[in-house]
């Protein structure tokens, strides 16, 4: 008997984990495995359904990731998304894939041409496309069920085999009825019940941590953010006093952040906390460094070195807890995924690290972590705190870093946070922060010519950090932020607002 579990096979798509997340939103357990998993392993997992993810390769190319054709003989429903649909087409008899004359990227209008279980209750609506190849001919026994103005086969299905394919991405929020399409696949095609929840995930993860760690000592790095707080709390629930938390003040934090971390984690969590003042050490290492990737690598390496030194003082700590999220993993790249930038929690770690990593949140997105934080009973000021990168203000200062620039950025960032909270937008916005570019501009203040730094205000809305849109803040709020910054922050004479979405930009500037 098949279990209420969905297997997502990852072909290197940037949205692979997002698929699994959407499945979990439907209260169905999901796991991700690489595309080259063996048939025996799939049988052992015994899923109720399989989803082929998208991917950056061409199914017609020599480096196309393939799967054993035996997967189609397992009598398990399959949904192919983007590359996954093209792969299904290429491997099944009668199907053909071709390079389209024009690619299709971004929003498109889906026209449903034939109703099946996948499209029950679904009407013509906006979907999100990202492809160049397209299905030329559907496999034997399949019917074309949807199209767009550019793509004649935007969806296909074989109800008898329970094989379905969509060229668009139902997992992203820009596909208006995408979650309902996924629900149809889960409940109408696969027949799952939908009884899994976050409490189950917490219990499973706590059991896994107990088994992995045994009686070993563990250290955790606290930053004050929700990720490290939730990760540390989960580990503490699993192993208790075997965990010691360490807070490294690298001098790249926001205003008042170090004090808040020490106060909150000692008082709220009652977990032993070691405070390390490493501000001078980090700034010395970063002196003269301009390249953002080099900054990240230096900070990641120095962070681990500090941890190793503190661990030796504490005793034999074998494990390091990190609040790595899946969005971090995606942007750092994998075997089949493209690298966007290395993350302090992933690609910024040195190879010669003395710790084994515990990353209980590695397969989760930020909003899921917040749900777990609420289940664990963490305070709102931690659960709803906006994301802050591991390298801190180092990647919000373009170019070289020094004490003066850090002070300018801290003051400007503090004003932004104060005003956005006061206006009631803090929880609605995914991130809001200041960026200090490596340039100056001419201004006039008090009838005197000035030559000062501009501050870039970045505020975005998002559900998961995979995509983001610039926040439509009221003009009055923008004016208030700008006025306060140029009047209260020395050496700043201009404020500009970044209105770029992700993609093409990333949320952070570096």
UniProtKB/Swiss-Prot annotation:
Gene Ontology terms for molecular function: ATP binding; GMP synthase activity
Q: Which residues form the GMPS ATP-PPase domain?
A: 196-385
- Quaternary structure note: Homodimer.
Q: Is ATP-binding among this UniProt entry's keywords?
A: yes
Reactions that this protein is recorded to catalyse? XMP + L-glutamine + ATP + H2O = GMP + L-glutamate + AMP + diphosphate + 2 H(+)
Tell me the classification of the organism that encodes this protein: Bacteria, Bacillati, Bacillota, Clostridia, Halanaerobiales
The residues listed in the UniProt record as binding ATP, with positions renumbered to this chain, are 223-229
Name the chain's protein.
GMP synthase [glutamine-hydrolyzing]
Q: Does the keyword Cell wall biogenesis/degradation apply?
A: no
Task: Show where the Glutamine amidotransferase type-1 domain sits.
Answer: 5-195
Function of this protein? Catalyzes the synthesis of GMP from XMP.
């Amino acid at each position: 008997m098949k279990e209420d579990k969905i297997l997502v096979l990852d072909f290197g798509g940037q949205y692979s984990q997002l698929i699994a997340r959407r499945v979990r939103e439907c209260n169905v357990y999901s796991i991700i495995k690489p595309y080259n998993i063996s048939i025996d392993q799939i049988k052992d997992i015994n899923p109720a359904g399989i989803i082929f993810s998208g991917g950056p390769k061409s199914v017609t190319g020599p480096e196309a990731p393939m799967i054993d054709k035996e997967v189609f003989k397992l009598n398990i429903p399959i949904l192919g998304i983007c590359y996954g649909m093209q792969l299904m087409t290429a491997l099944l008899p009668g199907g053909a894939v071709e390079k389209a004359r024009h690619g299709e990227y971004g929003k498109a209008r889906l026209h449903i041409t034939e109703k099946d279980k996948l499209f029950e209750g679904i009407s013509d609506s906006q979907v999100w496309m990202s492809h160049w190849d397209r299905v030329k001919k559907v496999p034997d026994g399949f019917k074309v069920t949807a199209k767009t103005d550019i793509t004649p086969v935007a969806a296909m299905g074989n109800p008898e085999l329970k094989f379905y394919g969509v060229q668009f991405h139902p997992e992203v929020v820009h596909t208006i009825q995408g979650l309902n399409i996924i629900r149809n696949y889960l409940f109408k095609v696969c027949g799952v019940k939908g009884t899994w929840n976050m409490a189950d995930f917490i219990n499973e993860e706590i059991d896994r941590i107990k088994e992995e760690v045994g009686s070993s000592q563990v250290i955790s790095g606290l930053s004050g953010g929700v990720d490290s707080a939730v990760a540390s709390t989960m580990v503490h629930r699993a192993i208790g006093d075997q965990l010691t938390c360490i807070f490294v003040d690298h001098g790249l934090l926001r205003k008042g952040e170090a004090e808040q971390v020490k106060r909150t984690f000692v008082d709220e969590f009652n977990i032993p906390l070691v405070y390390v003042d490493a501000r001078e050490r980090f700034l010395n290492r970063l002196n003269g460094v301009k390249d953002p990737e080099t900054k990240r690598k230096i900070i990641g390496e120095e962070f681990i070195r500090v941890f190793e030194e503190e661990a030796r003082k504490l005793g034999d700590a074998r494990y390091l807890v990190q609040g790595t999220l899946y969005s971090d993993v995606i942007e750092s790249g994998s075997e089949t995924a493209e690298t966007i930038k290395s993350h302090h929690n992933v690609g910024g770690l040195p190879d010669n690290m003395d710790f084994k990593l515990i990353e209980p949140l590695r397969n989760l997105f930020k909003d899921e972590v917040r749900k777990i934080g609420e289940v664990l009973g963490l305070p709102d000021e931690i659960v709803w705190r906006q994301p802050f990168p591991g390298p801190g203000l180092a990647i919000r200062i373009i170019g070289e870093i020094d004490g003066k620039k850090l002070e300018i950025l801290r003051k400007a960032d503090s004003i932004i946070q104060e005003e956005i909270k006061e206006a009631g937008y803090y929880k609605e916005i995914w991130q809001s922060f200041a960026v200090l570019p490596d340039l100056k501009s001419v201004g006039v203040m008090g009838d005197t010519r000035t030559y000062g730094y501009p501050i870039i205000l970045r505020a975005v809305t998002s559900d998961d950090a995979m995509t983001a849109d610039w926040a439509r803040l009221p003009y009055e709020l923008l004016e208030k932020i700008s006025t306060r910054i140029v009047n209260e922050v020395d050496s700043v004479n201009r404020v500009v607002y970044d209105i770029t979405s992700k993609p093409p930009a990333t949320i952070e500037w570096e």
